[in-house]
From Swiss-Prot:
CDD domains: bHLH_dnHLH_ID4. Its main location: nucleus. Residues 116-161 are annotated as: Disordered. It comes from Sus scrofa (Pig). It is found in: Nucleus. This is DNA-binding protein inhibitor ID-4. SMART domains: HLH. Keywords: Nucleus, Repressor, Transcription, Transcription regulation. Heterodimer with other HLH proteins. Transcriptional regulator (lacking a basic DNA binding domain) which negatively regulates the basic helix-loop-helix (bHLH) transcription factors by forming heterodimers and inhibiting their DNA binding and transcriptional activity. Implicated in regulating a variety of cellular processes, including cellular growth, senescence, differentiation, apoptosis, angiogenesis, and neoplastic transformation. GO terms for cellular component: cytoplasm; nucleus. The lineage of its organism: Eukaryota, Metazoa, Chordata, Craniata, Vertebrata. Residues 117-126 have a biased composition (Pro residues). It holds the Pfam family HLH. GO terms for molecular function: protein dimerization activity; transcription corepressor activity.
Length: 161
């Protein structure tokens, strides 16, 4: 006789402290183990494997949630238009961030020092089919070598990694 337990709908978790036994029974049923007298050790081992598998499956989701919360708290600190003493939802943070980025872009485009600079010289015209030797480009991997490491303050690192 196989042990079968009701399966929770996907996307819903059991309340904390619940579901461990259900998970073990469901795991036993899925793996074809029986609950005979000699199967106690097999049941315990299967339950341990299933709990470890469930914990490993939840870890990436937990880490992603942790990273997202950390990013929102950084945005809350960095964007000056977000009221510091008021509880602001994640949905309310995003319009503040978008407005702040647009303000920064406008400030850069209208900055007097940038307006006074002469435009860069036009490239020389070359006959069709010929192309001058261009200077070698820096590979993107060299450009993306952890610039945040030099800028981040202590406590700004992503929590889960």
């Amino acid at each position: 006789m196989k042990a079968v337990s009701p399966v929770r709908p996907s996307g819903r978790k059991a309340p904390s402290g619940c579901g461990g036994g259900e998970l073990a029974l469901r795991c036993l049923a899925e793996h074809g183990h029986s609950l005979g007298g000699s199967a106690a050790a097999a049941a315990a081992a299967a339950a341990a494997r299933c709990k470890a598998a469930e914990a490993a499956a939840d870890e990436p989701a937990l880490c992603l949630q942790c990273d997202m919360n950390d990013c929102y708290s950084r945005l809350r600190r960095l964007v000056p238009t977000i009221p510091p003493n008021k509880k602001v939802s994640k949905v309310e943070i995003l319009p503040h961030v978008i407005d702040y980025i647009l303000d920064l872009q406008l400030a850069l485009e209208t900055h007097p020092a940038l307006l006074r600079q002469p435009p860069p010289p036009a490239p020389p015209h070359h006959p069709a089919g010929t192309c001058p030797a261009a200077p070698p480009r820096t590979p993107l991997t060299a450009l993306n070598t952890d610039p945040a490491g030099a800028v981040n303050k202590q406590g700004d690192s992503i929590l889960c990694r």
